[in-house]
Regions:
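Alpha/beta-hydrolase-fold enzymes
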Residues: 122-209
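Catalytic active-site module of serine/aspartate enzymes centered on a nucleophile-bearing elbow/loop
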Residues: 271, 275-309
Length: 309
């Protein structure tokens, strides 16, 4: 059976000890995959996916971002990155984990997987650190609808001025997530947009480390990140030869029900990326790794990874 090893490393912010996990296979290591998780969640939720890949010869590593999971030092810190430049701190922490893991497994291909906010962080990462990756999987991503993001960033700035960057803002939370259930029939909870699997939704709601309201500071950081990854001059810094696999559900509001994911995919092609694939799952919602057809999703990811080794 695969085995888990938990460890910590010093964050780029010089203050926090970032919590991380490594899942290793019993036998030969064929490749490494690093996971960047989404907003208001943590890496323990990825344990089944990590085990699945480890059973197929992958070392899988992941860390709780600043303000998330076991990296957050208290409840107030949940969904807060830093007083200043938090987005870049989180991306730099991803790079630290990459370097630590690549040094440990120097002779095998290295992949990066990012989901939701982690997809935006991953898209930032491949701009700022384009080297050393055999491929990238981008899950549950979205597009930058310019004026909306600019307005959200301004609102977050005003909230920071009025209440401070660590303020957990109901206004920003509603702006970000308030409309996500609107297209579904028979809505049971406010988080039905995550997945059709009710047990997963209930576990998320019951988890004290999941579902924290976004702080003004983190929301401001994330809007800045969305602006950064949409600029042509930044996209041109990517290694165009790195394979990229976009995957999402066509019932995911974060990706505008597949339409925004298609636009990001097309933007990568227009930028000159040579190996880009898009997979949309019918009726799938935001967390395809936790959907009713997750076995199919796992198998598709593995098939793509294997094709790039």
């Amino acid at each position: 059976m695969p085995s888990f090893h938990d460890f910590r490393f010093l964050s780029t912010d010089g203050k926090h000890n970032v919590f991380a996990r490594e899942c290793t296979p019993d036998g030969e290591v064929r490749a490494v995959l690093q996971i960047a998780h989404g907003v208001a969640e943590h890496i323990y939720r990825y344990a089944p996916f990590m085990e699945f890949l480890a059973e197929n010869g992958f070392v899988v590593v992941a860390n709780d971002h600043l303000g998330h999971g076991k990296t957050a030092e208290n409840e107030q810190e949940l969904c807060f990155f830093a007083e200043k430049d938090g987005w870049n701190d989180v991306v730099s922490d991803m790079d630290t984990l990459h370097k630590l893991t690549a040094a440990k497994y120097p002779d095998v291909p290295y992949f990066l997987f990012g989901h939701s906010m982690g997809s935006f962080l991953t898209r930032t990462y491949i701009i700022d650190h384009p080297e050393g990756l055999k491929g990238v999987v981008i899950s549950g991503t979205g597009q930058n609808p310019g004026a909306v993001v600019a307005a959200g960033k301004l609102m977050a700035k005003l909230e920071m001025i009025d209440n401070g960057p660590m303020y957990h803002s109901p206004t920003l939370d509603k702006l970000a997530f308030g409309s996500y259930n609107k297209k579904y029939d028979h809505v049971r909870t406010k988080l039905d947009w995550l997945t059709r699997d009710e047990a997963v939704v209930d576990a998320y709601i019951a988890d004290p480390l999941c579902g924290a309201m976004a702080t003004a500071g983190m929301f401001h950081d994330m809007m800045g990140g969305l602006q950064y990854i949409w600029k042509t001059e930044n996209l041109n810094k990517m290694d165009k030869s790195t394979p990229v696999y976009f995957m999402a559900g066509d019932g995911d509001p974060v990706g505008n029900y597949g339409e925004a994911v298609k636009k990001v995919y097309e933007r990568f092609l227009k930028t000159g990326c040579k190996d880009v694939k898009l997979k949309l799952y019918k009726d799938g919602r935001h967390e395809m790794l936790n959907e009713l057809n997750k076995d199919e999703v796992y198998a598709d990811i593995l098939e793509w990874l294997n094709s790039k080794i």
